[in-house]
Amino acid sequence: MFERIISFAIQQRWLVLLAVFGMAGLGIFSYNRLPIDAVPDITNVQVQVNTSAPGYSPLETEQRATYPIEVVMAGLPGLEQTRSLSRYGLSQVTVIFKDGTDVYFARQLVNQRIQEAKDNLPEGVVPAMGPISTGLGEIYLWTVEAEEGARKADGTAYTPTDLREIQDWVVRPQLRNVPGVTEINTIGGFNKQYLVAPSLERLASYGLTLTDVVNALNKNNDNVGAGYIERRGEQYLVRAPGQVASEDDIRNIIVGTAQGQPIRIRDIGDVEIGKELRTGAATENGKEVVLGTVFMLIGENSRAVSKAVDEKVASINRTMPEGVKIVTVYDRTRLVDKAIATVKKNLLEGAVLVIVILFLFLGNIRAALITATIIPLAMLFTFTGMVNYKISANLMSLGALDFGIIIDGAVVIVENCVRRLAHAQEHHGRPLTRSERFHEVFAAAKEARRPLIFGQLIIMIVYLPIFALTGVEGKMFHPMAFTVVLALLGAMILSVTFVPAAVALFIGERVAEKENRLMLWAKRRYEPLLEKSLANTAVVLTFAAVSIVLCVAIAARLGSEFIPNLNEGDIAIQALRIPGTSLSQSVEMQKTIETTLKAKFPEIERVFARTGTAEIASDLMPPNISDGYIMLKPEKDWPEPKKTHAELLSAIQEEAGKIPGNNYEFSQPIQLRFNELISGVRSDVAVKIFGDDNNVLSETAKKVSAVLQGIPGAQEVKVEQTTGLPMLTVKIDREKAARYGLNMSDVQDAVATGVGGRDSGTFFQGDRRFDIVVRLPEAVRGEVEALRRLPIPLPKGVDARTTFIPLSEVATLEMAPGPNQISRENGKRRIVISANVRGRDIGSFVPEAEAAIQSQVKIPAGYWMTWGGTFEQLQSATTRLQVVVPVALLLVFVLLFAMFNNIKDGLLVFTGIPFALTGGILALWIRGIPMSITAAVGFIALCGVAVLNGLVMLSFIRSLREEGHSLDSAVRVGALTRLRPVLMTALVASLGFVPMAIATGTGAEVQRPLATVVIGGILSSTALTLLVLPVLYRLAHRKDEDAEDTREPVTQTHQPDQGRQPA
């Protein structure tokens, strides 16, 4: 089949070139559509169910809202896990499905179960699904701010309520229409409300209740349609508008009568534009702001959506009221562009180094250009495949591309073509005719097809273990393996079509094969080393064995981690205060943090934070926690450009630690989301304790936390805050209430309306709409003594008059701490102890911590402990790779056996793998890089290249033996003759990774372990292949040589017709 393809490519060379140009055009088109991101989206298929339960304590929220929803979700097709969180007035259930489940199908299933759950939920408690977004969907954040001295049309200054109104009714509707945006979340400022604040004394004097006020507002704020009438041939619609249109309309609503006189709302209280009882706030650089967040639709490209949002924001800014502006505070595009710039720089520099090596070794400019052309063509082919399979270009997907490996097949054919054309021209003593040239090109490509196919297949097979990874690790590394295989496949297709056609067209007259000075120098140095190796077999083999043993010992001492942390350039800081800290107090404390850090560190561009829970409760946080972001200036603008990111982080931690009342957890914006998606917590390591009793869980967690704090490397150890929320409990005495003829709900309604407020209609203002709320004045609802005097209406007597008793007659008010939050996982309560690991690897930290906990903490019967975080993924990936990698290596050996039809020679080539691993391990150890899945991918790639090194040399030695050379002659001549392709293989593969190994840009730390392993491994593999493999081959075949007749030694350098093996 390949012969027919090669023949067609040469005969129809212009057609082939035209097809290649077409493929390149499609690749360019695909490149412009290629999704670009910093890292792969590892979000599992999950659906959030958020339920608002106003006034419910965490325990009641769990009992009345969370549990019924969890129960109905059990048994869903493809269900993998449920996680839930119950806080004051809010419930969140996260339903996680198996990978591959369609997210829209999952949402449909969840929605069906929500309908079933509604029957078991209290009145007014309505669950709703979260946005169709991913855990990394928060791609763009902005603030709505008023400039200093800005005034509204009436001359008054802008208030937080005004800015929130602009955000909700001007900015948000426009941004929601941007393609790729699924939801806009808002936090900060106050939702505008029309507040009716009755006076208790006036209500009682008129014999009215809070319920009377609510009913009056509901009855006097509606429009009614009455069909139509026909009159004189025309049809008139009949309507009776009754909506309130101003504050005066509300004030004039009649609540009741007294002595024949109407009693209006203005007679019993005040009507004003009030503030909601908010659950969250936002701050920036020490002042309160309104903060908006874009949630990206799942499957969209973050860079494209961010750019579209940014353009829309610029458009909206031009239409904002004078003095009010939108300020972008976080844009994912900034990180994406920096990360992709690092990838581009590494790939371009690697390509340049590879091309230089080609020019130096091939000695023919046209041949080198044809070979180098494979690099952009293979990349364009890869881009087309990535677009079709919806793989984004990111640090991981492009992180393992090595152009030296990719062009190996093209080098096989081009070098063989050049050699055959040169020999044919030398034989004829004249330039070749076109038909002779085509014949030689066909023969050269035909000879090279076997090593080409086997070489490419071996490298593809060593990437198979990566496809066996599942879960988070699979989503991280599948794109990497897929792009490498795509690039290899594209290069292989081009090698048997474009390369023969291009060689036939552009390489013809005066072709000469000559060795350059570099190769002559290399041969002069290599020959005496080879002779010494062959003369000292025992020493060479002992040295090789000792090297392998030493590196195995070093490998055992290497630390381990899942993947290196990407330096995003910005810092995430979570400030935690004691449970029960009010929202207003928390905001003031957060302002102090922001102003202190901004003033102390000129490297900081801005600090902003979300305190509490936003309007869309995708991330439930109590008011005592602030989720902050420290946005840094570009390093070139730092006063001390030599200061490292780690040094700055350490200084910020130290300075923040001086501010009293706060505990901190430091991370990075994307990193904390990664951790949260992986294990449901934001830290690197999480210890989860499961059980039934909250008090037992809390006590056990404190003991575990104390142990963790003593483990070296543990930082920011904290226990999930499950207790300590101050509660004011109104304990109703049933007997006393019954004596007054009161139901429990009569007392509860009075308390709920007076303190919490009750929605009593909507105020329409054009497209805008605002709640009308009945609630007691702040001076009353904030005082415990005033609440004890809250009038409770008694059932009407014979005279139909309403009488009242104070709340204290039927209830007592008690202040005591209660549960702060209740977390559950798979239907069981749990508490989390979280920690970040710094200064050491996670792989060694967890076993040490686990042993310490087992020896020092006794877990009560019926309770159990598990570990979560990135360590869990490291274990999972390691376990799977330990099974799959040997299988892949076995397949490689099967291919080698098929190539040689000889187990002995297959095993000899296979020895290149341990030789390569020694260099990779040594390189990691020298650079102080722990073992990670990224480094493991490097070792996997290394196995393929190392096998090719041996294949290059051994195939040629075998061909010399078949032609009659003695064993010693074949080994010497073969090793010296194959020095060039072995060095080319090593240099192009290793130099292609050099830019990744030494890069310092954004994302370089993710690629560095892989590049370090490949470079170190190729250097050791090449050295050992050139010196050890000839010794091993002679040793393995000495008995065969003794059994054969002695042949005449061949002294001249042999130039066989067989094509060069893979380079």
From Swiss-Prot:
Predominant location: membrane
How is this protein situated with respect to the membrane?
A: Multi-pass membrane protein
Is Transport set as a keyword in this record?
yes
- Which portions of the chain have biased composition (kind: Polar residues)? 1049-1063
> One GO MF term, please?
monoatomic cation transmembrane transporter activity
One Pfam family hit: ACR_tran
Q: Where in the cell is it found?
A: Cell inner membrane
User: According to the UniProt record, which cysteines are disulfide-bonded?
Assistant: none
Q: Which SUPFAM superfamilies match?
A: Multidrug efflux transporter AcrB pore domain, PN1, PN2, PC1 and PC2 subdomains, Multidrug efflux transporter AcrB TolC docking domain, DN and DC subdomains, Multidrug efflux transporter AcrB transmembrane domain
Which Gene3D superfamilies does UniProt cross-reference here?
Multidrug efflux transporter AcrB pore domain, Multidrug efflux transporter AcrB pore domain like, Multidrug efflux transporter AcrB TolC docking domain, DN and DC subdomains, Multidrug efflux transporter AcrB transmembrane domain
Q: Which residues cross the membrane?
A: 14-34, 350-370, 371-391, 395-415, 452-472, 487-507, 534-554, 883-903, 906-926, 937-957, 981-1001, 1013-1033
Explain what induces or represses this protein's expression: By zinc, cadmium and cobalt (zinc being the best and cobalt being the worst inducer).
Instruction: Summarize the biotechnology note.
Output: In the presence of 2 mM Cd(2+) or 4-10 mM Zn(2+) up to 99% of the metal is removed from the culture supernatant and is sequestered via bioprecipitation. Additionally Cu(2+), Co(2+), Ni(2+), Pb(2+), Y(3+) and Ge(4+) can also be removed from culture supernatants, although it is not clear which efflux system is responsible for all these substrates.
| InterPro entries in UniProt | AcrB_DN_DC_subdom (IPR027463), Acrflvin-R (IPR001036), CusA-like (IPR004763)
Q: Where is this region: Disordered?
A: 1040-1063
Q: What does this protein do?
A: Has a low cation transport activity for cobalt, it is essential for the expression of cobalt, zinc, and cadmium resistance. CzcA and CzcB together would act in zinc efflux nearly as effectively as the complete CZC efflux system (CzcABC).
The record ties this protein, via PANTHER family, to:
CATION EFFLUX SYSTEM (ACRB_ACRD_ACRF FAMILY) (PTHR32063:SF24), PTHR32063
What protein name applies here? Answer: Cobalt-zinc-cadmium resistance protein CzcA
**What's the source species for this entry?**
Cupriavidus metallidurans (strain ATCC 43123 / DSM 2839 / NBRC 102507 / CH34)
